[in-house]
């Protein structure tokens, strides 16, 4: 008897390049990117600068490196960075913010979001020499560990205006900014406008095998180029990967709404179980983070049992589980995954 294909909801990073994306990669004209001679990389950088409303952009091999380069460009060792609670830079980059940039992160807010008032309260006074100077505010949009929540743009504008007034730089970790744009109906340029530097990723919802871009002023991009080299991220014929990113921008950006609908379907099914605690208002894009009630299996047990039934998930804590919809998961597969999880929980 034929077995059903595995449904991988661990992350949107598990997507595989489509046949058409692979063809675009194979046909991409390339050159030495460190000499500025890779035409496909140059095209991607120019396009992203325009999409994000910035003067320039720089390709990097990963979102983590983009974040780390941004920290090095916008801070000095010993500085303090104000971030959202459970941000990627603090929870998923193996201490890189301390090791690479020499900064400490101060988490504020709740569920991936904070207010301008909370931000201002976290800024250390420079009159006290015992404090690390607050020099940067970082916002993650959408916010991974908070279930793909979209940071309210009105609050973003207030926070970044206050940062400028108080002499702090601003950075947007927009690894999933494409999702935020689709969910909010705002352009990427609008979402990125208040920030000094912006990072976006191509290896998640857009389905490319790797790559991110930093965008900002020409001066900041020159500095980022130096730090990219310092961290080992400067590559040669990167047009092969840049072509995948361009293909994703052309063909996979608008369809992100399908992923969002699939996540909503999954969340609504799970929310009907007494074993699940899930605030449906938090399910705004393609990530579903749910909590297991007392008496239900713990996260590790549920993940193991789901795997036996062909559904892959991630445990995000003792009683917290994450599921992520993406390019490689159909509506039918989402429905099957939801059915499997309800059977395991009820």
Residue ranges of model-derived segments:
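Conserved PLP-enzyme active-site core in the AAT-like
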Residues: 2-309, 313-329, 333-345
């Amino acid at each position: 008897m034929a077995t059903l294909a595995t449904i991988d909801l661990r992350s949107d990073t598990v997507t595989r390049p489509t046949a058409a994306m692979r063809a675009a990669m194979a046909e991409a004209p390339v050159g030495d990117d460190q000499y500025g001679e890779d035409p496909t990389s140059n095209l991607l950088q120019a396009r992203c600068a325009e999409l994000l409303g910035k003067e320039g952009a720089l390709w990097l091999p990963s979102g983590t490196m983009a974040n780390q380069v941004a920290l090095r460009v916008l801070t000095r060792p010993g500085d303090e960075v104000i971030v959202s609670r459970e941000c990627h830079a603090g929870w998923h980059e193996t201490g890189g913010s301390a090791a690479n940039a020499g900064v400490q992160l101060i988490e504020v807010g709740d569920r991936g979001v904070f207010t301008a008032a909370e931000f201002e309260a976290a800024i250390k006074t420079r009159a006290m020499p015992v404090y690390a100077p607050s020099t940067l505010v970082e916002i993650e949009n959408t916010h991974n560990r908070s279930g793909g929540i979209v940071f309210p743009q009105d609050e973003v504008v207030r926070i970044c205006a206050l940062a400028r007034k108080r002499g702090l730089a601003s950075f947007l970790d927009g690894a999933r900014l494409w999702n935020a744009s689709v969910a909010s109906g705002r352009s990427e340029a609008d979402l990125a406008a208040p920030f000094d530097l912006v990072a976006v990723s191509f290896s998640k919802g857009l389905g490319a095998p790797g790559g991110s871009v930093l965008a900002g002023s020409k001066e900041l991009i020159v500095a980022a180029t130096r730090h990219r080299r310092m961290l080992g991220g400067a590559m040669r014929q990167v047009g092969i990967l840049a072509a995948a990113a361009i293909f994703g921008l052309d063909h996979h950006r608008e369809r992100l709404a399908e992923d969002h609908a699939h996540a909503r379907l999954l969340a609504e099914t799970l929310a009907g179980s007494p074993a699940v605690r899930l605030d449906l208002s938090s399910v705004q894009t393609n990530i579903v983070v749910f909590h297991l009630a007392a008496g239900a299996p713990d996260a590790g047990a549920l993940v193991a049992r789901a795997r036996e039934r062909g559904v892959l998930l991630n445990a995000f804590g003792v009683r917290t589980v994450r599921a992520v919809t993406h390019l490689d998961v159909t509506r039918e597969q989402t429905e099957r995954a939801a059915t499997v999880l309800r059977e395991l929980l009820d």
